[in-house]
Swiss-Prot record:
CDD domains documented for this protein: KRAB_A-box
Main subcellular location: nucleus
UniProt protein name: Zinc finger protein 224
Tissue: Ubiquitous. Mainly expressed in fetal tissues.
Gene: ZNF224
UniProt subcellular location: Nucleus
UniProt crosslink position (Glycyl lysine isopeptide (Lys-Gly) (interchain with G-Cter in SUMO2)): 473, 625
């Protein structure tokens, strides 16, 4: 038996995968494979391996199979020199001479390039070699041993160590163990690469930004950030990626595949790492800690984003408006604001969104899903971050402080929005009307005014709302829920803002000042109503009588006079009222409630006006007196009216007959005589009247009352 034994070559330690086998490996296994191939090649160079004899490698690159053949060493006057030939299988006959250094660079480049630059499943071309398939799916090259008794062949190895190494592939044995974490490896080179993680060793440095890496493959992947290279393209949408693993994850978006399920809540994820990070929400584990402030996070990516808060680093800048961002994804989402692009569409209603997260949030509006529950009050939330913010309400924690006034806030976004009140900045502009807003959320809500969009419907009465909080407040009218209680008087309210306005009644605070007359109000709503006195603005007109009002609510109350509608009913006596405030005042007759107390004697009154009249007796205030006939008048407003009666001044003139009046109301009633207008109609006999008072007197005829 004759054995052909040659010097150790790269093929003796090479492990070759087919393209199908490579597809079964995950990202970590592929990286390990490339690092092992590089390590073996370096070891050969370190022991003085200078020639490849007749070894052949096949590389899969850009849909071409490259076959690299090492030519024999040629001697010349210039000394030893290695020449190689690169031959394309699909283009036979094309040759190119390469130096030894170029061979090394080519191998190193192809072995460590990302997943698409992988070794092909073609066999070594040396006659007498054949592959052996192992249980792990590895294809290992054996050298054949020629028998002296015929043409038969059987596998043999150059030495015992190679045979032992080969046997480990069949048995699945991993004889090299890491002392730090106990992880096992088949190759000593793989163990050495792994140990760099524990030692913190980073041998490979980026020339552009100086960032260091423990593996050369990680460096090459990182360099694509600077070059912008994205060699992995999605067949479905054409989107490019710098890593094959990112492309594989992206493919699942098109297929809808979510193989990783949470056992706690059943939520599914595309990637295993996403599931692991999600599970920490249930366990409360936060292994990633900030060295600056000690804050902990459940994911490394969240820690990295947080670290930029301390450094104030915002490396990604928008070319259109020069705004900077900490993350590239945030920059990409921001650019869509300028382009108007909304690539993520809701299948239910067709609404478009800039980022996928907004689409996920919107989907929960249709499904009603709220998986995160507060242990304190039982309230449910769609997102864990919203639950975290809500829990600060119970704990009272306000970690975000305004540098101008020191005010604390539950969330960072609230603090940013508040700081714009100091600067006056309103960066979010409406394209339709040009109105500016401090928050994007406010702009989104405002734009629904132009579109008329009302996504949120009340299940009780079918009324629609443009915002979910508005629907929530409306539903409390049906349920009667009033969760906000005043600690001073015990009065309850449906909205927190109503409670704040009410509390100013006790404190006497009036922070909203009129710029015209300096009068103060405890709510902005009351200030807005007052300012229409100065402007004279009355945009809401009654179609029945033409009377104008400054507010829609005032018009609604007025229209009930024409229709006779009295929707507010007293449960005690059945009497009905046109306004809710009238009902509340009336109910005090039955309850005996007297909330208005006299500061002098402590006497209680049902109405503020009666208390004011009573207090004048203590102060012995001289009542207002009519100068014409000496009649005492209690109210100041009545005094002004009385003075106009006796004065010659009648500023309101009728254009038809020239008759003058001291009040606009009297002129309006008089003009109905000329127009023949009778807007007040009796429902019993259809008789019409020009004044409401005349109608009320007439209705007494039907009920049998004597005025």
């Amino acid at each position: 038996m004759t054995t052909f034994k040659e010097a150790m070559t790269f093929k003796d330690v090479a492990v070759v995968f087919t393209e199908e086998e490579l597809g079964l490996l995950d990202l970590a296994q592929r990286k390990l494979y490339r690092d092992v191939m590089l390590e073996n090649f370096r070891n050969l160079l370190s022991v003085g391996h200078q020639a490849f004899h007749r070894d052949t490698f096949h590389f899969l690159r850009e849909e071409k199979i490259w076959m690299m053949k090492t030519a024999i060493q040629r001697e010349g006057n210039s000394g030893d020199k290695i020449q190689t030939e690169m031959e394309t299988v699909s283009e036979a006959g094309t040759h190119q001479e390469w130096s030894f250094q170029q061979i090394w660079e080519k191998i190193a480049s192809d072995l460590t390039r990302s997943q698409d630059l992988m070794i092909n499943s073609s066999q070594f071309s040396k006659e007498g070699d054949f592959p052996c398939q192992t249980e792990a799916g590895l294809s290992v090259i054996h050298t054949r041993q020629k028998s002296s008794q015929g043409n038969g062949y059987k596998p043999s190895f150059s030495d015992v160590s190679h045979f032992d190494f080969h046997q480990q592939l069949h048995s699945g044995e991993k004889s090299h163990t890491c002392d730090e974490c106990g992880k096992n490896f088949c190759y000593i080179s793989a163990l050495r690469i792994h140990q760099r993680v524990h030692m913190g060793e980073k041998c490979y440095k980026c020339d552009v930004c100086g960032k260091e890496f423990s593996q050369s493959s990680h460096l090459q992947t990182h360099q694509r950030v600077h070059t912008g290279e994205k060699p992995f393209k999605c067949v479905e949408c054409g989107k490019g990626f710098s890593r094959r693993s990112a492309l594989n994850v992206h493919h699942k978006l098109h297929t809808g595949e979510k193989p990783y399920n949470c056992e706690e809540c059943g939520k599914a994820f595309i990637h295993d790492s996403q599931l692991q990070e999600h599970q920490r929400i249930h366990t409360g584990e936060k292994p990633f800690k900030c060295d600056i402030c000690g804050k902990s996070f459940c994911g490394r990516s969240r820690l990295n984003r947080h670290s930029m808060v301390h450094t104030a680093e915002k490396p990604f800048r928008c070319d259109t408006c020069d705004k900077s961002f900490r993350q590239r994804s945030a920059l990409n989402s921001h650019r869509m604001i300028h382009t108007g692009e909304k690539p993520y569409k809701c299948e239910e209603c067709g609404k478009g969104f800039i980022c996928r997260r907004d689409l996920y949030t919107h989907h929960m509006v249709h499904t009603g899903e709220k998986p995160y529950n507060c242990k304190e009050c039982g309230k449910s939330f769609r997102w864990a971050s919203c639950l975290l913010k809500h829990q600060r309400v119970h704990s009272g924690e306000k970690p975000f402080k305004c540098e101008e006034c020191g005010k604390g806030f539950y969330t960072n976004s609230q603090c940013y929005s508040h700081q714009r009140s100091h600067s006056g900045e309103k960066p979010y502009k409406c394209v339709e009307c040009g109105k500016g807003y401090k928050r994007r959320l406010d702009l989104d809500f405002h734009q629904r005014v132009h579109t008329g969009e009302k996504l949120y419907n009340c299940k009780e009465c079918g009324k629609s709302f443009s915002r979910a909080p508005c629907l929530l407040k409306h539903e409390r009218l049906h349920s009667g829920e009033k969760p906000f209680q005043c600690e001073e008087c015990g009065k309850r309210f449906t909205q927190n803002s109503h409670l704040h306005s009410h509390q100013r009644v006790h404190t006497g605070e009036k922070p909203y000042k009129c710029e015209k007359c300096g009068k103060g109000y405890n709510s902005k709503f009351n200030l807005d109503m007052h300012q229409k006195v100065h402007t004279g603005e009355r945009p809401y007109n009654c179609k029945e009588c033409g009377k104008s009002f400054g507010w829609a609510s005032c018009l609604l109350k007025h229209q009930r006079l024409h229709s006779g509608e009295k929707p507010f009913k007293c449960e005690e006596c059945g009497k009905r009222f046109t306004q809710n405030s009238q009902l509340h005042s009336h109910q005090r007759v039955h309850t005996g409630e007297k909330p208005y107390k006299c500061d002098e004697c402590g006497k209680g009154f049902s109405w503020s006006s009666t208390r004011l009249t009573h207090q004048r007796r203590h102060s012995r205030e001289t009542p207002l007196k009519c100068e014409q006939h000496g009649k005492n008048i209690v109210q100041n407003s009545f005094s002004k009216v009385q003075e106009k009666v006796h004065s010659v001044e009648k500023p309101y003139k009728c254009e038809d007959c020239g008759k003058g009046y001291n009040r606009r109301l009297n002129l309006d009633m008089h003009q109905r005589v000329h127009m023949g207008e009778k807007t007040w109609k009796c429902r019993e006999c259809d008789m019409c009247f020009s004044q409401a008072s005349s109608l009320r007197l007439h209705q007494n005829v039907h009920v049998g009352e004597k005025p």
